UniProtKB/Swiss-Prot annotation:
This is Molybdenum cofactor guanylyltransferase. The gene is mobA. It catalyses: Mo-molybdopterin + GTP + H(+) = Mo-molybdopterin guanine dinucleotide + diphosphate. GTP binds at L8, A9, G10, K20, D64, D98. Its main location: cytoplasm. It comes from the Bacteria. HAMAP family: MobA. Mg(2+) binds at D98. GO terms for biological process: bis(molybdopterin guanine dinucleotide)molybdenum biosynthetic process. Keywords: Cytoplasm, GTP-binding, Magnesium, Metal-binding, Molybdenum cofactor biosynthesis, Nucleotide-binding, Transferase. The N-terminal domain determines nucleotide recognition and specific binding, while the C-terminal domain determines the specific binding to the target protein. Monomer. One of its GO terms (molecular function) is metal ion binding.
Length: 190
């Protein structure tokens, strides 16, 4: 199965006080840390609105489709699925830009259970998921019904457990979360 990847970077970053994708963690922007996903997929794009040049990573930056701007991660996944289909991929793995500790076997394990989303310690992580390109009509139907909850989209998907400590899907929403992540990196430094 040909698999593409998308980094969901469309959030406003209100609690962080700035755009999370560009927040440095030990001197490296969060989005660059999440880009470690790249070797696991055939191609990677970024889902974000606004100036695509701000990322400076040389990757395609996919805005939400007209009429779907600001509708949350499902809009980014929808744009990513169009892009994935256009490059000949059969599936798309999505990840959030504020999850810098993703497992090195994320794509492999999600693909083995496809369609699937990650789960850690009983908590579902619907933005860390593998979506088949054939999911597009379901997303369109949910949008038509004014449904934006990504959990609804993943109905029927397998929850793949990643129960390692520390949590590989810990997301960074606040400056306090960022400080904890800095501590985590310091503790794991050689």
């Amino acid at each position: 199965m040909r698999i593409a990847g998308i980094i969901l970077a469309g959030g406003q970053g209100r609690r962080m006080g700035r755009e999370k994708a560009l927040v440095p963690l030990s001197g490296v922007p969060l989005i660059a840390r999440v880009l470690a996903l790249a070797p696991q997929v055939e191609a990677v794009a970024i889902s974000a609105n606004g100036d695509p040049g701000r990322f400076g990573l040389g990757l395609p930056v996919l805005p939400d489709r007209p009429g779907e701007s600001g509708l949350g991660p499902m809009a980014g996944i929808r744009a990513g699925l169009d892009w994935a289909a256009g490059i000949g991929a059969e599936a798309l793995v999505s990840t959030a830009t504020d999850t810098p500790f993703l497992p090195e076997d994320l794509v492999e394990r999600l693909a083995a259970a496809a369609p699937a989303h990650a789960q850690s310690f009983g908590r579902d992580h619907y933005t860390a998921a593998l979506w088949r390109v054939a999911t597009v009509p379901r997303i369109d139907a949910l949008f038509a019904a004014d449904e934006r909850r990504i959990a609804r989209l993943s109905g029927g998907a397998v929850a793949v457990p990643f129960d390692t400590t520390p949590d590989p899907f810990a997301n960074l929403n606040t400056p306090e979360d960022l400080a904890r992540a800095e501590d985590r990196l310091r503790q794991n430094a050689p």
